[in-house]
């Protein structure tokens, strides 16, 4: 999982897993944006483009200002939201 912050020309900071990075575009999955929380000083996360049906979104790089690493706390929160939970294939006998 490659969690990055993507700053769009529109001013949005999108946090997503970048699954492919080419010279012309990036392909992301599970994109979210930070939104103000009712509690002062806190933020919450909301889906970016929640009406899309696709699992992967291709973004042309001409609409991207920069791509960077989010703060470690943001990465951990993202991974807890979208990380795959692996379960053992065999049952343990206790």
Each PLM stretch: what is its role?
Residues 1-94:
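Conserved RNA-binding domains used in RNP assembly and mRNA/RNA metabolism
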């Amino acid at each position: 999982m490659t969690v990055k912050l993507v700053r769009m020309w529109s001013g949005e900071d999108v946090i997503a897993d970048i699954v492919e990075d080419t010279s012309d575009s990036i392909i992301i999955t599970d994109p979210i944006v930070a939104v103000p929380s009712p509690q002062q000083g806190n933020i919450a996360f909301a889906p970016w483009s929640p009406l899309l049906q696709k699992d992967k979104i291709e973004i042309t790089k001409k609409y991207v200002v920069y791509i960077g690493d989010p703060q470690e706390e943001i990465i951990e929160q993202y991974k807890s939201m979208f990380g795959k939970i692996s379960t053992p294939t065999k049952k343990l006998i206790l």
